Each structure stands twice: as C-alpha cells, then as structure tokens.
C-alpha cells in the first residue's frame, strides 16, 4: 500500500465516521429535548427510567464513535510506519499519533474530553431525576 492510498483510506474512514458522529449529535440533542419535556410536563417513574436508558445509550453511542475516530488515526499511523521510505509528512504523523496498535476504548484518552462527557451525563441525569 502506498502513502497516498493510506491517506485516501483515512479520508474515507473520516467521512464515514463523520456521518455517524453527526447522527450521534442529533440524538444527543433529542435526549436534551426529552429532558426539557420531562421538566416542563413532569413524568412518571417508568418514563424517567426509559429516558435515562435512552440518554445513557446515546452517550455510549457517541463515545464509541469517537473511539473509532481515534482508531482511524492510529491505524493510519501504523500503516505509514510499515512503509519502506515514508515521507517527512508521514514521519510527522507517526511522531504525533504514535505507531502502536490500539483497540477501541469508551474511555477518552483526552482528559478534557472525558470531563466534557461526564458533564453531559450529569446534565442529562439531573435534568431527568431532579426538579
């Protein structure tokens, strides 16, 4: 595989991941709209349980999609490291991303991103269960 093909494959994977991430953001918006409906109109216990499951499922989905984005970066970097004569640009990417094999993880590697998702979960849960 050539360097061009690796970058082309990375670009294609980002397009696909971007579509799934956009869907995840839409679903997150739907979850927050559901929280507003619960706060405005009230809800029974079973409705709150289902809203909780729906919200946590959306957070799980989004964390999974963002882990795939990280895996795309790292897989491309690993593929570049297997080239016989990588370019300077490829070397910079390998230095920045690393060249070790990785598996998807729901725990974000960036601590700020992890805190952001924790805040989203707290906002959803307090909106559903507290009034």
Per-region residue spans from a language model:
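Compact alpha-helical subdomains of small soluble proteins
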Residues: 67, 99-102, 130
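Membrane-interface helix-boundary motifs at transmembrane edges
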Residues: 35-46
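Hydrophobic alpha-helical transmembrane segments
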Residues: 16, 90-123
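Transmembrane alpha-helical segments in integral membrane proteins
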Residues: 26-36, 107-131
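Residue-level signal for the membrane-embedded core of alpha-helical transmembrane segments
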Residues: 18-25, 53, 57, 116-120
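Hydrophobic alpha-helical membrane-insertion segments
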Residues: 49-77
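Juxtamembrane non-transmembrane "cap" segments at the membrane-aqueous interface
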Residues: 67-94
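Cytosolic-side membrane-entry/anchor segment at the start of a transmembrane helix
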Residues: 1-32
